[in-house]
Curated annotation (Swiss-Prot):
One GO CC term on file: cytoplasm
Any one GO BP annotation for this protein: division septum assembly
Taxonomic placement: Bacteria, Pseudomonadati, Pseudomonadota, Gammaproteobacteria, Enterobacterales
Superkingdom, natural source: Bacteria
Protein name: Cell division protein ZapB
Coiled coil feature spans: 6-78
Length: 79
């Protein structure tokens, strides 16, 4: 009877070890995925910053052209 108890205990311990091993592998996979996603977020943030700067530059250029157009229209009205 004692031997059967030890066999059952051994099976349960082995199952626990297998479960722990699988969970450790899953944790490693999730860590890798997290690192990949973190890099993607950083790249996206950098891309966003570049787009914001480009947008500001384009707005400034638009204002310059609008001012030039207004000046040209003003000269045309004088004629």
């Amino acid at each position: 009877m004692s031997f059967e108890v030890f066999e059952k205990l051994e099976v349960k311990v082995q199952q626990a070890i297998d479960t722990i091993t699988l969970l450790q592998m899953e944790i490693e996979e999730l860590k890798e995925k997290n690192n990949t996603l973190s890099q993607e977020v950083q790249e996206a943030a950098g891309g966003r910053e570049a787009l914001v700067r480009e947008n500001e530059q384009l707005k400034q250029e638009q204002h310059v052209w609008q001012d030039r157009l207004r000046a040209l229209l003003g000269k045309m009205e004088e004629v």
